[in-house]
């Protein structure tokens, strides 16, 4: 709603945050790209229903112990290798969601001092070999293809950790997350912002998409050492390029400023698409 935008801007003034940190409107190309990635991420809840026709499935990613689900896909029309993770879909996933212990990011030693969400790191460890092997196979066969990672909710944090890992091997990895919880500490956030050129919207390859008052980006609490990264793209109704806001600087100014708590209506629906509904 427009009211959300007004409240966010008012909050920025109260917090002393420069208004220039919130910019209204994105290009049609950017908006269409966000919607496309949201479609894939929401479809992951229902075995990739109704994904764009140009995208073909390479292989499924799965670990029974953590119930992490995902797929490696390929879009030859865009020359792109895509990895997508499903969000929370079971009690096993919920156990990962609520493990807020910060775990050292030991699989990425380049990320000095980095720690990430303990539950999602366990998820990453459970599928790391599958993901890296599948992406390597595709990248070797389709040289020059871009590498993109996406996901919603739990899948968003899985995507972020995966993209961080892949960025150590591949140039210009792209990351699109939807309703992403806070995923790591300040060292991790700084690493991600540098690795994904997130100093400005013009250069970023890390699009952290939020919606209205989605409550999940407010967890885990910042007081526990968690910090968001990437450039936030905040979508409000009615969805359009003009109603998409670019939020940089202080993370508590757009979605997070709305006071949403937990899994609410705004969390399960992005750009009018409800997780797994396949009605788009």
From Swiss-Prot:
Activity regulation details: Metal or basic ions Mn(2+), Ni(+), Mg(2+), and NH(4)(+) decrease the activity by 4.4% to 14.1%. The enzymatic activity is inhibited by Zn(2+) at a low concentration (1 mM) but not a high concentration (5 mM). Loses about a quarter of activity by the addition of 1 mM of Cu(2+) or Fe(3+) and activity is completely suppressed when the concentration was up to 5 mM. Low concentrations (0.25 and 0.5 M) of NaCl improve the activity by 5.6 % or 8.3%, respectively.
Alphabetized InterPro entries for the sequence: AB_hydrolase_fold, AB_hydrolase_lip/est, Fungal_lipase-type
Glycosylated residues in this chain: 99
UniProt source species: Penicillium parvum
Name this protein carries in UniProt: Feruloyl esterase 1
Uses described in the biotechnology field: Feruloyl esterase (FAE) is a critical enzyme in bio-extraction of ferulic acid (FA) from plant cell wall. Synergistic action with the endo-xylanase XYN1 leads to the release of 72.32% and 4.00% of the alkali-extractable FA from de-starched wheat bran (DSWB) or de-starched corn bran (DSCB), respectively. Meanwhile, if the substrates were pretreated with 1.75% (for DSWB) or 1.0% (for DSCB) of phosphoric acid (PA) at 90 degrees Celsius for 12 h, the release efficiencies of FA were up to 84.64% for DSWB and 66.73% for DSCB.
GO MF entries: feruloyl esterase activity
Function: Involved in degradation of plant cell walls. Hydrolyzes the feruloyl-arabinose ester bond in arabinoxylans, and the feruloyl-galactose ester bond in pectin.
Species classification: Eukaryota, Fungi, Dikarya, Ascomycota, Pezizomycotina
Recorded catalytic activity of this chain's protein: feruloyl-polysaccharide + H2O = ferulate + polysaccharide
Catalytic EC class: hydrolase
Protein family according to the UniProt entry: Belongs to the AB hydrolase superfamily. FaeA family.
Known EC number: 3.1.1.73
